[in-house]
UniProtKB/Swiss-Prot annotation:
Protein name (record): ATP synthase subunit beta, chloroplastic
Classification via Gene3D superfamilies: 2.40.10.170, Bovine Mitochondrial F1-atpase, Atp Synthase Beta Chain, Chain D, domain 3 (1.10.1140.10), P-loop containing nucleotide triphosphate hydrolases (3.40.50.300)
Organism, as annotated: Canella winterana
A Gene Ontology cellular-component term: mitochondrion
Enzyme class: translocase
Length: 498
C-alpha cells in the first residue's frame, strides 16, 4: 500500500523519470514493446500507451508486462481494447505494478480493473492506493479458528456448512442457479453482516452486475444519501471486456478486500462471480504469449495462476476474508481442469445439479456431491452431524434404488425400502426453499431458516413422525411448521374439490 501525495491517481507522475518505448507488434490484446538498451521494465509493471488513433481520437490504454523477450523487447497484455493502436506509438513505463484505490473511498462505488470508477458519480479518492500483485500472508500470520457461518439456506447449513473466514465454491453448469444462489447469500449475509463486502464480477453478464447494483441501492447496502456509509465495493470486468481485464479484475477486488482486512482489521466478505472466467481469460492470452497449451487447451500455468489468487484469500490475526466463489463447470464435467484445480483450495463445495434443477427443486444443491471440512462432530456438534449423515444415507439409498424403481416399479421394493424412498422424496423436496432474490420471479416470499429449525425439521422427517403428510407439502417451504400447515391446506383443498 502507498499513500499518494496528490489525488492524481495511480498513473504517471513525472514522465521525465520514466522509460519510453515504442510498440513493435500488436496481436489482439497482446503488444510487443521495444525499449532502449538497459531500460527494460520489470514483469507486472504497468505500461501506458498514449496518443491519437487514425481518426484523431485520444487513446489511453494500460498494459501489464508479462514476458521479457530479449532484444530489448517485452510482451504485455492490454487491459482495454487495442483498437486504434499502431506500430511506433509511444509507450510509457510507469515503473510500478497496477495500483488501485483502497479503503473507505471504494465503498458504494463501482470500479473497473484499473480502479477507475465506472458509475458516473465522479472521480474516486486515490490518495491511498495498493498494487494488485503482492505475496500471500506468511504462515505465522494466519488464523486457524474454526466457526460456522450460518446462511439461512437449509441444504447448505445442514449438509455442507460454510466456515467463517473460509473459502466456499458454488459449482454448476450453465443455468442451474449459481448466480441466484450467490445473490441470495449476498442478501442473507451481507445485509446482516457488520463488516464490509467486496463483489468481483469476473467475466459474467453486465445485466446481472447492473441488477445487483440496483438491488443493493434498494436494500440500503449502498447508501445513496451518504455513499461513505455503504457496506460494499463493486469491481466489474464483465464478458464484454478484453481478456487482460478479466484476468486481473479478481486481483483488483481482492486487493480492496485485503486492505479492509489488514489495515482496517475488519471481517470482509469477498464474492467472486465467476472464478472460471479468470481461468478462461488466462487461457485466452496464454497462447498469444507463446505458451504451449496444456490439458484440454488450458494454459500450462493454470495451477500457479489459481494458487496466486486463492492463497491471498485467507484469514489472518488482523481480520478475516470469507470468500464465496461461483465456479462454472464446462459441460457439467467436474473433472475439467478448471473446476478440478479450484476444488483443491476450498473449505466447502456446494455442487449444483442439473437433474435437481430439471425437477424444479431450487436451490438445486446436490446433497451427496456437496462437501465441507466443517461437517465434523467436534465442530458442528453430535446432533447436527448425525442428522446430516442420516439425510445423506437416506438420499444415497434412494439413488441406488432408482434403477430398480425405473425397471420394476415401486411395488417390487420391500416395505423398508418403500419407506426409505418416501422419506427420501420428502427430504429432497424439503431441501428446496423460496429465495428472497427470486420473489419477483416466483411470487412466493423468501424464507430464512435458522440452523436449529433446519435440524429439527429433518429429524422429524427421519423419525417417521411426518410419514402421513403428502410429499408436495414439503416443496418450497421454510421450516417444518410451514410444511405441516401446507399439508393441512392441501387436505382442505382436496376435500373441497370432492
Amino acid at each position: 500500500m502507498r499513500i499518494n501525495p496528490t489525488t492524481s491517481g495511480p498513473g504517471v507522475s513525472t514522465l521525465e523519470e520514466k522509460n519510453l518505448g515504442r510498440i513493435a507488434q500488436i496481436i489482439g490484446p497482446v503488444l510487443d514493446v521495444a525499449f532502449p538498451p538497459g531500460k527494460m521494465p520489470n514483469i507486472y509493471n504497468a505500461l501506458i500507451v498514449k496518443g491519437r488513433d487514425t481518426v484523431d481520437q485520444q487513446i489511453n490504454v494500460t498494459c501489464e508486462v508479462q514476458q521479457l523477450l530479449g532484444n530489448n523487447r517485452v510482451r504485455a497484455v492490454a487491459m482495454s481494447a487495442t483498437d486504434g493502436l499502431t506500430r511506433g506509438m509511444e509507450v510509457i513505463d510507469t515503473g510500478a505494478p497496477l495500483s488501485v484505490p483502497v479503503g473507505g473511498a471504494t465503498l458504494g462505488r463501482i470500479f473497473n480493473v484499473l480502479g477507475e470508477p465506472i458509475d458516473n458519480l465522479g472521480p474516486a479518492d486515490t490518495r491511498t492506493t495498493s498494487p494488485i500483485h503482492r505475496s500471500a500472508p506468511a504462515f505465522i500470520q494466519l488464523d486457524t479458528k474454526l466457526s460456522i457461518f450460518e446462511t439461512g439456506i437449509k441444504v447448505v447449513d445442514l449438509l455442507a456448512p460454510y466456515r467463517r473466514g473460509g473459502k466456499i465454491g458454488l459449482f454448476g453448469g450453465a443455468g442451474v442457479g449459481k448466480t441466484v444462489l450467490i445473490m441470495e447469500l449476498i442478501n442473507n449475509i451481507a445485509k446482516a453482516h457488520g463488516g464490509v463486502s467486496v463483489f468481483g464480477g469476473v467475466g459474467e453478464r453486465t445485466r446481472e452486475g447492473n441488477d445487483l447494483y440496483m438491488e443493493m441501492k434498494e436494500s440500503g447496502v449502498i447508501n445513496e444519501e451518504n455513499i461513505a456509509e455503504s457496506k460494499v465495493a463493486l469491481v466489474y470486468g464483465q464478458m464484454n471486456e478484453p481478456p487482460g481485464a478479466r484476468m486481473r479484475v479478481g486481483l483488483t477486488a481482492l486487493t480492496m478486500a485485503e486492505y479492509f482486512r489488514d489495515v482496517n482489521e475488519q471481517d470482509v466478505l469477498l464474492f467472486i462471480d465467476n472464478i472460471f472466467r479468470f481461468v478462461q481469460a488466462g487461457s485466452e492470452v496464454s497462447a498469444l504469449l507463446g505458451r504451449m497449451p496444456s490439458a484440454v487447451g488450458y494454459q500450462p500455468t493454470l495451477s500457479t495462476e489459481m494458487g496466486s489468487l486463492q492463497e491471498r484469500i485467507t484469514s489472518t490475526k488482523e481480520g478475516s476474508i470469507t470468500s464465496i466463489q461461483a465456479v462454472y463447470v464446462p459441460a457439467d464435467d467436474l473433472t475439467d481442469p478448471a473446476p478440478a484445480t479450484t476444488f483443491a483450495h476450498l473449505d466447502a463445495t456446494t455442487v449444483l445439479s442439473r437433474g435437481l434443477a430439471a425437477k424444479g427443486i431450487y436451490p438445486a444443491v446436490d446433497p451427496l456431491d456437496s462437501t465441507s471440512t466443517m461437517l465434523q462432530p467436534r465442530i458442528v456438534g453430535e446432533e447436527h452431524y448425525e442428522t446430516a449423515q442420516r439425510v445423506k444415507q437416506t438420499s444415497q439409498r434412494y439413488k441406488e434404488l432408482q434403477d430398480i424403481i425405473a425397471i420394476l416399479g415401486l411395488d417390487e421394493l420391500s416395505e423398508e425400502d418403500r419407506l426409505t424412498v418416501a422419506r427420501a422424496r420428502k427430504i429432497e423436496r424439503f431441501l428446496s426453499q423460496p429465495f428472497f432474490v427470486a420473489e419477483v420471479f416466483t411470487g412466493s416470499p423468501g424464507k430464512y431458516v435458522g440452523l436449529a429449525e433446519t435440524i429439527r425439521g429433518f429429524q422429524l422427517i427421519l423419525s417417521g413422525e411426518l410419514d402421513g403428510l403428502p410429499e408436495q407439502a414439503f416443496y418450497l417451504v421454510g421450516n417444518i411448521d410451514e410444511a405441516t400447515a401446507k399439508a393441512m391446506n392441501l387436505d382442505v383443498e382436496s376435500k373441497l374439490k370432492k
